[in-house]
Amino acid sequence: MVGGAPEQRQLFLQPFLATKGAPLAAFALTEPGGSANVGSPSPGEGVRTTARRVGDSWVISGRKQWISAATGWNGEGADLLTVVCRTDANVEPSRGISIIAVPRPDSGLIFEHAFDTLGHRTHLMPRFRFDAVPVPAGNLLGQEGRGLQLAAESFAGSAALVGIFGVALMRAAFQFALSFAKSDRRGGIHQIIQHQAVGYALADAKTTIEAARALSWHACRALDTAAPGALELAIHAKVFGSEAAVRVITNLMQVVGVDSYGHELPLAGLLQDAMALPLFAGGNIGVRRRQLHALMLDPAYDDLATLDGICLAENVP
């Protein structure tokens, strides 16, 4: 739990460490209008969900959407929401946005709409609102006004994970396409893998998969060891892995042919899932490339920092 004090981690994370049940947690940042502008200084833009201090409580009001797992298992809400909200609308976002942990409330959490998505259909990403939901003041994570910084830390980890998602989808598509190419003749006398065009397409796909895998692994290791270039590596893993997944799966569908367009084969579904990766957990254009641009604009930027901690074969534990 990024920003959480030890006692908060004990309180909120204990159910997730238990051997019984299957609690769900969700990170609530995105609002109607998108999340690329979360740092807008105007209270009418960016983060518009508010948390108002009333006695020993924060009272949360506002809308969120595209929040994975927010509905929970039964449509009544996730067991724990961490909510990005404005705690002070009179200062700039770098000092006026906070994150508050919200256990599933008895009332005031209202689900308004379930999006009908192209892929990732095993869980809902709804639009919902907080209707004056009170939570204890002690549920504030970290210091008041540090919400954007904490969100950025959280999204570093999620960036690397999206790179891994891309690798997983590409691997599944490659394994199917390779097996298909080795067994199917498409009406000819040879398995289609004997054709150079098919073999080269498979080779290119495997090269990209291995590159994405290595980059994602390096990013995760850098995050685990707090290496200097960890944030940049994580963003590269997200951008490269997510966009590679769409491209590689599309190319593998061409190896298989028109049958891959139907849901009788797995490739169409894998592509539908892959198409979400450049868009969520910080869109590649609206958020992630902008982050990379900002890193490179910094006068202290070191383009070799991403090499720090790189593992040589003899040093791998």
Task: Name what the model sees in each region.
Residues 111-210:
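Glycine-rich beta->alpha junctions and the first turn(s) of the following alpha-helix
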Residues 63-109:
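A short core secondary-structure module
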Residues 182, 186, 190, 206-240, ...:
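C-terminal helix-coil-helix/basic helical segment that borders enzyme active sites and/or dimer interfaces
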